[in-house]
Structure formats: structure tokens, C-alpha cells
Curated annotation (Swiss-Prot):
It comes from Acinetobacter baumannii (strain ATCC 17978 / DSM 105126 / CIP 53.77 / LMG 1025 / NCDC KC755 / 5377). The lineage of its organism: Bacteria, Pseudomonadati, Pseudomonadota, Gammaproteobacteria, Moraxellales. One of its GO terms (cellular component) is polyphosphate kinase complex. Catalyzes the reversible transfer of the terminal phosphate of ATP to form a long-chain polyphosphate (polyP). This is Polyphosphate kinase. HAMAP family: Polyphosphate_kinase. The active site is at residue 443. Keywords: ATP-binding, Kinase, Magnesium, Metal-binding, Nucleotide-binding, Phosphoprotein, Transferase. Its EC number is 2.7.4.1. InterPro entries: PP_kinase, PP_kinase_C_1, PP_kinase_middle, PP_kinase_middle_dom_sf, PPK_C_dom2, PPK_N_dom, PPK_N_dom_sf. One of its GO terms (biological process) is polyphosphate biosynthetic process.
Amino acid sequence: MNTAITATTPTEYSYNDRYINRELSILDFHLRVLEQAVDPLHPLLERMNFLLIFSRNLDEFFEIRVAGVMEQFALGNESRSPDGLTPRQVLQKISETAHAAIERQYRILNEEILPKLREEDICFLRRGELTPAQSAWVKKYFQEQVAPVLTPISLDPAHPFPRLVNKSLNFIVTLEGKDAFGRQIDLAVVPAPRSLPRVVRLPDELTGGKEHHVMLSAIIHEHVSDLFPGMTATGCYQFRVTRNADLALNEDVEDLAKALKGELSSRRFGRAVRLEVTQNCPQHIYEYLLEEFDLNEEQLYKVDGPVNLARLVSNFKRPHLRYDSHTPVVPKVFKKTESIFSAMQKQDILLHHPFESFAPVIQLLREAARDPQVLAIKQTLYRSGADSEIVQVLAEAARNGKEVTAVIELRARFDEESNIEVANVLQEAGAVVVYGIVGYKTHAKMIMVVRRENNKLVRYVHLGTGNYHAMNARIYTDYGLMTTDKDLCEDVHRIFQELTGMGKMAKLKKLLHAPFTLHAQLINFIDEEIANAKAGRKAQIIVKVNALTEVQLINKLYEASQAGVQVDLIIRYDLLFTSGITKFIGKHSGTFNCRTVSFEHTRVYYFSNNGDARIYCSSADWMDRNLFNRVEACFPIEDPALKKRIYQQGLLNYLQDNQQAWLLQGDGTWVRAQPAAGEKLHNAQRELLETFK
């Protein structure tokens, strides 16, 4: 399959030819996720799941990215980003794209997913479809399970418009009549607590054993008049407001955890950035809501269905409508030995999640917690959860008298509250808990175990590209390296010293680490490939990351391509530049081959290095925040067999994908990869599932 894209020269394009707006690039990624919902290669319930993922993704996009641009616009910022757009222009483009995408999302739901589910006897019944017996059951359910937890709020001078929680389901009700106090009430708001399920399954005896469900919104809509005795509800309309959820935290505070706790509550009531209403909501009602939330019609989204598809989930009992479950395999090296420590002493061990099990990582900690020869355990935690097995094992180790040090990043977005709880659990167990470096998020993924062996201290290290989160390790692809390499272990030790103590930058032997050496060394590696290409030697760079937005590296990749280096990019969601193919195709010997796939999380950097390839795995994407504002670890893969595995399975395999990959075009748009004439179908992730059976 020929997907090469010829690069451009720096003198032949303006900045907006070279760069893609970051917000629009992220939105493009979400649109590619939405396209999975119409892909016939996916089973039906997996397609439905992609619709829900799209909703969750879009929620966060508005909460963080759109909210940030709105703040720039509100402050009168008219400066242009590298792509040439002002904040106002970005907001307009987002609105146009998002409105069209959401309309398409609900059309897919109503015209494709729900009808096909009905063919499988999975139904979401509308109010008019209920039988008398089902209606009676729903009424009883409302009276016993729903009404007691609802709080209807009339809107009058004594009851101003309530502060509604971010992304909560609410109903605005139009009324006729007078209440118990003789007041004429025209409007009321009914918030639906998050504790209520959004989908209610009817009993089997009322459905003939079929999976019939009723939306909570339909139940409330049908019986909303019961909440206003003596009055008549003439209309009931769902709505949902999305708010700015980014946290503004002063880095100079004395107690980061305490300050963060104080800020978390504000996230629920930040400035409104989007209003969703149902299509049947009258104009005078949504205009009233827009005024209350200080929004305009550009920020209004009318939807043909429930206003929150992200919670449209249920435990459907249809295995044939889902992918077969995959049981992650345990590498053979662990099956040949009783101890993780003895396995790691024999060789470096590469784990490729979710195809290979995350269990060896947990087992390393468990053995360390219970081994009398283990003296200390040190670990970074970014997203884990207080109830995770890793946190529980670390707490056990501390209670067993081990010196446990946890470097917890409290500011991991949307996991702040959970991470505070993790810190409390570990502190109560006796662990030393630190929050990293003020002004820098700790994003490196590192474990170090110190063990006494033959009167010497031996270190065991795990380095990863993804979080220490067992559930995520079953969903996202990541690499982990388990090693006793003395230089790597010493480097990890020095980074932990940086994180917990004070002193100058640690000089490392093998690891590259941000914010100190990583960016500069990446530039050096690219320069070496440029020199090789100019000398007539084969030169190739492959970058597999979630995001590539750092301008210096982007410019250096352009330079490399112009020099004749083959540049292959595998980017999950955020890409800041375009290849320029539409204007400058065929003018240079170098090529760009840029593609994207969903649910990939590995960060791998490959430099051909004149036949002696360099392969690094890392916690860092190629973004300003990772390279300059975070503590990151980038580790070399040196074992020839492991290098071959990563190159073939983690890089070349994805470059050959012609089913799930999307290819970047010269105008910044993406097209779905298609097999060339006579070319075999190739799905990279499916190939790995087959490999690791």
C-alpha cells in the first residue's frame, strides 16, 4: 500500500500551511472515534459503545479545550495561533464541526443502532409503546424509587434559578395552576440525581424474557405532574449544561493536597460552555436557559434523544454482539520460575499490554511486600485509584515494615480526588508520600524494588509507557520493561532522588528524562538521521505517540524529510502539522507516512541509526507539556530480541494496517486506509490478538 506523502521546504509555505489548529486536531480524533460506530467490522454492541465513548470524549473536549479557548476570547485575546486562527475563529469552526458531528451521532443511534438492537430483542421503549402492565410497573417504580429522591424547584423571586452541577441531567417543566400557597408558578426545574440509573430494565415477566428498557428521562417525563400536586405540567424538557472543568491552582500554596481539595468543588460549577436540549424544546424555553447560563445559540445543541448518551449503558446479555473476550497471556519466562525476582535476574522482560498480562507487575510488588529480604519500594502513581490492587499491595508493604515511597501526582486531570484518597491510604499505612516537584507534573512510570542478596543491595525496576492501572492495562496498549540492568536501575534511583529530595539535575547513564535531556536528545537523534540521509545512507524515523504538537520537533521532522529521511508517524489523537502534499508533492526525496489508530497509548521512538537501530519507549508524548513541564522517563530497549519485537509488532505492524488506520492528507484531513488492489487485509490489533493467544 503506497501511502507516502512528500514533504515541503520551509521557504515554500506559511505557518498556516504547515500547522493544524490543536483544538480542531483533537476534534478530528473524536470524529474518527465516531466513525467506528458505523463500521460493520465491529459487532453491534461495540458500535454502540463507540457512540458512548464519543459522548464522553466530547464532554471532556468542551470542559477543557473549548473552555480554554472561550477564556481567551472573553479576555479579548485576538492573537493567532501557529495555524493562523484567532480564538473567535477557532470557536466558530468548533461549533460548526461539533454541531454536525452530534447530529450525525444521534442519526446513527436512531437509524442504525437502535433498530438493529430491536432486531435482537433489545429495546428502549418509548412511553407510547408500554403495555398497561408495563405502565403500571413504571408508575410504581417512579413512586418508590425515583420520586423520593427528586427535588422539584419552582422558579420565582423566592426560588432563583438553581446552580446545576456540571453534566447533570435536568428537566425544565412548564406549569399551569397555583401551588399550595396560591402562587402562580409557570416554570420549575427538576434535577435528576446521579444516583439514579439512566436506563431501567423491565422485569422479564412483563417482556416475555426480552431485554426491554425504559429511559429514566421517559419515566420522569411521564409522571412529572405527580411532583406538582394540583397543577398541570404542560411541558417537560431535558437539558444538560457542560461547564469549564479545568482547575486553576496556585503552585505556591503551602499544602498542595489541601489546596486541591478546595478547588475540586468549583469544577462542578464552573462557567457554562455548552447547553444541550431535546429537539422538541420550545424556543422561548431554550432562550431562557441560554440567558441563565450566559450562552449564545452557537453554544446550544439540540439532540434527538437522551441528552447524555455517555450514561446510556446496560449489561446486555448478548455475547455474540460483542468481541470475544481476550485473556491476556503471561509470558513464558514467568511460568518457568516461582519468583518474579529470579525471572528478572535472567533477562530483561518486555510486557505488551493488553495482549500480555499486567499481573507480573502486581506480582513484583506483592512479592516485594512479603519478601523479608526486600528493604524498600519506590513507585510513581499518576492514575491508580485507592481501591486498586497496586495501592493495596503498597499499603501492605508499608505495614510490613518496608520503606515505601510513593510519588503521587495529585493533579492528574479528573483523577485528583482519587489521588488524594490514594495518598491518604498510603500515609495511614506508613508510606512516605510526596507530590513530586512544584510546577512540574510527575508523569514518569517507574517502580524500583531494593532487595538484599548475598550481603549486597540489588535493584529491580519496572519502566512503563502507561499508568499503573490494571483496568486501563486491559483496554489501552502500552509497553512495560522489567529489568535489573545496573545503569538503568541507577538512573531510576537518581530520578527518585530528584523527586523526593533536592539538588542539581541528575546525570543519567541511559535514561533520557524530561524536562532536562529528552527534548535535546531527540533533536540530536533526528540530526543524526539527517546526516545519514545526506551521506547517502538509509535513514528512517518512526514516532508512535498519542500527540505530536511540539513546534521544534515538528520543524526538525520537516527538515529530516527534506533531507531524504523516511518519516513514519503513528499518532493517536493530537497532531499539529500537515504534510503540505497538496502544494509540494514530488519535490523532495523524503516522505511522510502519517496515520492514526484508536485506543493506542504506547510511546515508541525509532531511529534507524545506519543499521544499528535505536528504540526508546517513554511516558512522554511529543508535546510542550511533556517535554518541558513534566517529569518523564524515556528508556532504551537494548536486547536485540526485544528491539525486533517492538519494531515488528509495535511499529511495522501498524504501518501495514489497512483496516483501522486513518491516513493524513496534505490539506490536514484524514481518510480511512484502504487495501490496495490485491493487498491482504491487515488489522494491526487483530494481528496482535492472534499472536498472543
